[in-house]
């Protein structure tokens, strides 16, 4: 009674509270009224803006009279006109903004709670920034609406202040960033959280799609994996597995041919039985391999079957315990399978389950299970083991019994005879105890023939080691220094040494080329460029389209669109040839769909190379039309080759060398090769054209270049005496004098220079080609001294017959300096990474758009227009064939002074003096006396004492250091006087 009254009292109290709370207080009433007025005002503004008509009278204009078409009446027309004038297109968003503001005000806290002025201040600031930036962006990007600006007066004023300073792009970027800042100030939402939300949403969508794709397979995988988990407790889990298998059969509607044994049928369909089948096949294959190895070993050692079996059962041939355990498990599985074939259906199920567990090779097989299997083995299995004894008597009986036996028994027999490990593991089983009693004669054979077998094995090991050592020293794939090659009968190498490709038909699909031409015209028209294809020149690698531009179209517009054209035409790279010599057209080079390889044999067999008479003729490749392109190194006279790694630079240098080897004998051309990488040019070691060994030490490279400078000066002296201008005239005059019977002697010979009593005759001067494979490495190790030597050779060595081939993979300004570029006008540029590298090599762009693999730009001497060349390819076999051909003709005659550095004064650079002939300063003796007495060897002390300049004092101190009077400067700059002090009188 009391509880019921209490419940009634509580109900009355709650009802009274609900009645009191349903009424609004003063502040809540004000907020709700503001919400109603805000929604009403936004609806009125929407109607006025959507039904605005420019003909209505408004604040911007007066009307001639007539009806007002605005649904908001005259007031609506005035309001819409004012909003459009102030905000432009943004006026359409003001009703929505008004509704949002009133809703936020309606949802604010109660009047007794604290108002955060900082928060509301940032919100108002963000709202103002959003409105201003939105008006500015609308004014820039959208068309005007009626006679109003798209951004209103706010956008016009803002852009009029920003555009003169920031331009269009800068103003747009500034307004966008300001808009983002205003959005953050207004809403308090971080842009990082927006990015994270988008990323998580994308990942969720991807995960949902993947789960959707995998959804069909989940129902099949779950029941398949369940029997494996229950395999440890198999007797209890067997009914549950059978029930699940029956459900799967009903769902998949697979007909059961044997309804009496549904479990066996389902186990055949399980994927888990696939590794079991593979494992059995692997075991049998491995056993067959062991049997084959056993017979092969018996054949090699000339041993009988009995000796082979004794060796298999010997203790020395036993494998490790891990392999023994593994073999035992395989045999247990096989025995289980045999017993299963001769038992009931339930026994078949247990045997198959047991064989599945063997796959795991873990602690699955227990001793109790092994005992069960041993008890289940019946008499036929024992007969199989008993029949193994007669198989060891002779080989014929062994093969006959093996062919007639059943597969399972032969399998066990092979395992017994070839692997003693298996018998050792099964000896603990009840079945395997009888195996040891079957063949008691095996131990006697082992004791009698063990020593003889070990001797045979030791002899075979000794012979095999000797054969391996001989094969290691006589490997045909190694480079042989001294080879006796047959001397060729031809004076120069023949084309048979090079690789000759099969005859290729130059099939040109005219329809495809015309289609590409129309595509080029249409893509150029997309960029508002009117051009017409007037010529198509297909080549082995690229095809050039010649364009006739419309009047007023600049070539620079097409050059700036090269990357866009490559993207539009789905090409790897597009190169624009701005000027074609002799034609008023612009070239557009596109790569072919199928690229052809230009082989060295094709160019050497061409008339251009065959008709060339200069011994320094070099092969470059083929031009865009497929014509062979060769050049004369004597007219270049030096060439600079540059390109990134893998662009074909080293192959191009090898092609130049091989082409000169095809044209010149050692009497005509000699080489000095500098190879810092020790790989590219070392293959030419031993050819008779070399003046010195291939230089791989960079310290010797400067000596070789210095020798070239001395040889250049010597040749100039000889040519001045002969009255000729170049090496060609010198050799011709020598020949004329020899034919006339008046050979010319060395005019600079002096008595004592040699053991001869009369001056020697002048000989023919060969061309000298200096090849540097990696010029950047040489500059890095030796320094600027190499640059001075190369610059001197490049300036004066042309007439003397000395030519340079410089290759580098780092085409930077610190390697290819202005001094080198000014004296080497001929350049070859392979693919480079940037336009800056292309300008460093060629003084113009284009090399960055090449296709690689021998594609190059050739800048001939005396021209500023490059030629697109597809470099010839020479394989390593071609290089070795030509080199071996020249090695068979003779050996090189090296000049030791080239690398040793013993040159005369003519090889010194301007201003450089030899160390032995260096003149001492006239004050040297006085300075020595002063330094020895004062025990101070500073430059400033010498300068003050003798009143000379700093440079002269420093030079004298360096001479003192060279003579060993003072030491080198220490870490503090002081020098120690090494000479002893004079004795005191």
Curated annotation (Swiss-Prot):
Designated gene of the protein: ftsK
Protein task: Essential cell division protein that coordinates cell division and chromosome segregation. The N-terminus is involved in assembly of the cell-division machinery. The C-terminus functions as a DNA motor that moves dsDNA in an ATP-dependent manner towards the dif recombination site, which is located within the replication terminus region. Translocation stops specifically at Xer-dif sites, where FtsK interacts with the Xer recombinase, allowing activation of chromosome unlinking by recombination. FtsK orienting polar sequences (KOPS) guide the direction of DNA translocation.
Presence of keyword Transmembrane helix: yes
Protein name: DNA translocase FtsK
Annotated ATP binding sites: 646-651
Assembly with partners or alone: Homohexamer. Forms a ring that surrounds DNA.
Protein localization: Cell inner membrane
Ranges where the FtsK domain occurs: 626-839
Organism annotation: Vibrio vulnificus (strain CMCP6)
